[in-house]
C-alpha cells in the first residue's frame, strides 16, 4: 500500500482556515470541507500522477464540492508532499512562492 501523503504545516494551516470559514457560514459545513479534503489527499497515494502539472513539478487536485479549492502537491523521492490548499482566486504567485520557499 502506498504511503499516506505528507501534509506540510502550511497546508494544514490552509485547511484549518478554510474549514473555520466554512463553519462560520453554516455549522457543520467546515466538517464537510475537511472530509472532502481528506478524501482528495488520501486518493493521491493511489494515483499521484493523475493530475496535470500546473507549473514546475507542482500538481493540483481540485475539490469537487468545494470547487474553488485545490490541493497543491509535488512528488519528492516517491512521496506525495501536500504543501497548500488554495482558493482559486488567490494569486498564483503566492502558490509558486510557497513552493519555491520549500525547495
Model segments located where?
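Enriched for short, Lys/Arg-rich terminal
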Residues: 66-70, 74-103
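Solvent-exposed, amphipathic alpha-helical segments
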Residues: 17, 36, 40-43
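Short, hydrophobic secondary-structure boundary micro-motifs
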Residues: 31, 52-54, 94
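Residue-level signal for well-ordered alpha-helical positions
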Residues: 18, 47, 95-98
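Basic/aromatic recognition patch in beta-strand/loop cores that engages polyanionic ligands
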Residues: 39, 46-81
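Generic structural signal for secondary-structure transition and capping sites
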Residues: 20, 27, 42, 46-49, ...
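Arg/Lys-rich, positively charged N-terminal/basic patches that mediate binding to nucleic acids
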Residues: 1-34, 103
